[in-house]
Every structure is written in C-alpha cells, then in structure tokens.
C-alpha cells in the first residue's frame, strides 16, 4: 500500500497536461507522503533548461520534461518526437535551450477522428498493412495512418534539420 512506502518518498514531481490528474496527484502527495509536490509548468517550478519561446506563451510540462531528459542523456542539437495523444516534435539547441517545436494529431487521435467524423468509416487499430494500396476500408485506413505518420515524422524532422542547418539527433518517446 502507499502507506507502506511512505518513508521511502521525500519529494514528488508532477508532470501532466491533464488538470484533474495534477489535482489528484497533489492530493495523494499531500495525504500520503506529507510533501508538497513540485508541479512542472507552474511559476514556482524552475527547470534546468532555458525555454526560448514567444513571451506570454507556455510549453506543456511533458515537453519540458522530455527536453530536460533528452539533453541530459544525449546533449544538444536534438529533436524529441513524442508519440502520444498528440505527436510533438521538440527542439533543443546545441546549448541545451528549448527553442520550440511542432504539434500534430497523434496516431490514435487520427484514427478516432476518421471513425467519429466520417460516418461510414469503422473503428480500426493501428497496424502495419501488408501493402500500401489497401483493398478494403480497414486496410486503406491503416495504410493512410501508418504510412502517413511515417511521412509526417520524416518530413517534419527533415524540415527542422533544414531550418536549423545543423546535424540533429532524433529521439523517439511516448506511448501512442
């Protein structure tokens, strides 16, 4: 139980883009671990990376944590591709600064949108099709999303490298 591991936890850091999750984890941290958590993305949370984005804008805590971890593990000149609800591309320069990125719909979100917004299209799971050209609706949808995402990732990474005019390492993470 949580009470049995209480003595082993002295600090808590929360990184979530879902307000309800942040709230619940704060309550859990306070109630079971008697500690006030650090919430990434809140004004009182200092991160060990320079965030260079337009004034008045915010970067999701998941993206900041990815950038800090990526830089710590692999250094600068890094593109971090996170496959989640959204597919994000975050860029860390040679000095370790977060310099921006790209947000695209996630793989499963795209499949869900096809099913929900196009009445005749069924729900399908992501799968690598045997051939690019599908011969039924499910195979066509799977091909479009599977190969479309490969194209999306390759092209966005290529354009970032072209724009930065530097060699970049590419790191993939996420849970789809």
Predicted features along the sequence, with ranges:
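Short beta-strand scaffold segments in enzyme catalytic cores
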Residues: 80, 87-92
